[in-house]
UniProtKB/Swiss-Prot annotation:
InterPro entries: Phosphoglycerate_kinase (IPR001576), Phosphoglycerate_kinase_N (IPR015824), Phosphoglycerate_kinase_sf (IPR036043)
Organism encoding this protein: Rhodococcus jostii (strain RHA1)
Catalytic activity: (2R)-3-phosphoglycerate + ATP = (2R)-3-phospho-glyceroyl phosphate + ADP
GO CC term (a single one): cytosol
An annotated Gene Ontology molecular function: ATP binding
Pathway where this protein functions: Carbohydrate degradation; glycolysis; pyruvate from D-glyceraldehyde 3-phosphate: step 2/5
This protein's UniProt keywords: ATP-binding, Cytoplasm, Glycolysis, Kinase, Nucleotide-binding, Transferase
Protein name: Phosphoglycerate kinase
Binding site for ATP: K211, G299, E330, G359, G360, D361, S362
Length: 403
């Protein structure tokens, strides 16, 4: 990777210097309880290394999708508490993004202190389509760290977005890739440069439209492309089969039909599914052939026959990339497909395969289903960023580090 890394910054010396770090702390919340702290834990090594080296660490991050103004339900307060616990040191939380409180706290930092700015998306300039507005916010962030400050990009989950705290700020300060971003790019490089074969990709999730670009990019390059999740039913409909009340994108049917024809030897789809009479955890459910989904019923998971077939493919693979659950794993009745596929990937990894879980819901499923995280070679923190990288798109937050 042709960028300077955290090690380069640490070697140059950070004691007494303020360092702005863009982390990805966008964790799921239930009220003010963090249900999956994975991204906080993944962000800790960079922050810890800087604090231990005597830097004044100023962290900026977002949570959820506030509408460009302060909103208590998206406050980083619970994140600050968890981050302090993970780091084993006090974390101050500024009452604003780049306002009076943030400035006063930044000026009062001593070596090794950590300051978390309030949700960066409380400021509308962060996601503005106007570059001049984003640059104004970036300059305000730079003011917090001063003339001898530095910027560390460690939020892999946002590097595919040209936002003020990801892109513009890197143009204004000496910039470095944090440990997490550096590791993620190395991992994705292994998937794209010369993956060991057979190379299998597993894609799930609800919409074909969300995954179309990655399907089109990967289908010509991989040996096997397994498709499950809600998006599968559009592929099923493309074969002229009734899908009942299952999720189906009518506008994508012709596209799915063309993909199935062009990549008949590569794309593998379920043969049986678990259907339900309603979308709920306690719905009546049954296992049926994909040709027998009754009207009024919906597919919420892949069936056991499909799990066995996919497992046979995956356990013989040498490289596996997985993005998206096979079913509604949040409901116990419809979690077996996701769990079975994940266990097959773990088995392949144990036999020497290189496996990557592509962030988002897949990573959440691994944790919720109690699967060992170290059973995979790598669990990415950035679902969207991973997919865009594999699609061959330029990631603005990476490109700017190379400049």
């Amino acid at each position: 990777m042709a960028v300077q890394t955290l090690d380069d910054l640490l070697n140059a010396g950070v004691e007494g210097r303020a360092v702005l770090v863009r982390s990805d702390l966008n964790v799921p919340l239930d009220g003010d309880r963090i249900t999956d702290p994975g991204r906080i834990i993944a962000s800790a090594p960079t922050l810890k290394a800087l604090a231990e080296a005597g830097a004044k660490v100023i962290v900026t991050a977002h949570l959820g999708r506030p509408k460009g103004e302060p909103d208590p339900q998206y406050s980083l307060a619970p994140v600050a508490v968890k981050l302090a616990e993970v780091l084993g040191r006090n974390v101050q939380l500024a009452g604003d993004v780049v306002g009076q409180d943030a400035l006063a706290r930044a000026e009062g930092l001593t070596d090794g202190d950590v300051l978390l700015l309030e949700n960066i998306r409380f400021d509308p300039r962060e996601t503005s389509k106007d570059e001049a507005e984003r640059t104004k916010l970036a300059k305000a962030l730079v003011e917090l760290v001063g003339d001898d400050g530095a910027f560390v990009s460690d939020g892999f989950g946002v590097v595919h977005r040209a936002q003020a705290s990801v892109y513009e700020v890197a143009k204004l300060l000496p910039h470095y890739a944090g440990k997490l971003v550096e590791a993620e790019i190395k991992v994705l490089g292994k998937l794209t440069e010369e993956p060991e074969r057979p190379y299998a990709v597993v894609l799930g999730g609800s919409k074909v439209s969300d995954k179309l670009a990655v399907i089109e990019a990967l289908a010509p390059k991989v040996d096997t492309l397994v498709i499950g999740g809600g998006m599968y039913y559009t592929f099923l409909a493309a074969q002229g089969v009734s899908v009942g009340n299952s999720l189906c994108e009518e506008s994508m049917i012709d596209t799915c039909k063309a993909l199935l024809e062009q990549y008949a030897d590569v794309i593998h789809i379920p043969q049986d599914v678990v259907i339900a009479d309603s979308f709920s955890a306690d719905a009546e459910s049954k296992i049926v052939s994909v040709l027998e989904i009754p009207d009024g019923w919906m597919g919420l998971d892949i069936g056991p026959q499909s799990v066995r077939r996919f497992a046979a493919i995956l356990t013989s693979a040498k490289t596996v990339f997985w993005n998206g659950p096979m079913g509604v794993f949040e409901f116990e009745k419809f979690a077996a497909g996701t769990k079975g596929v994940a266990e097959a990937i773990i088995e392949a990894t144990g036999k020497g395969a290189y496996s990557v879980v592509g962030g988002g819901d897949s990573a959440a499923a691994v944790r919720q289903l109690g699967l060992p995280e170290d059973g995979f070679s790598h669990i990415s923190t950035g679902g969207g960023a991973s997919l865009e990288y594999l699609e061959g798109k330029e990631l603005p937050g990476i490109a700017v580090l190379e400049g």
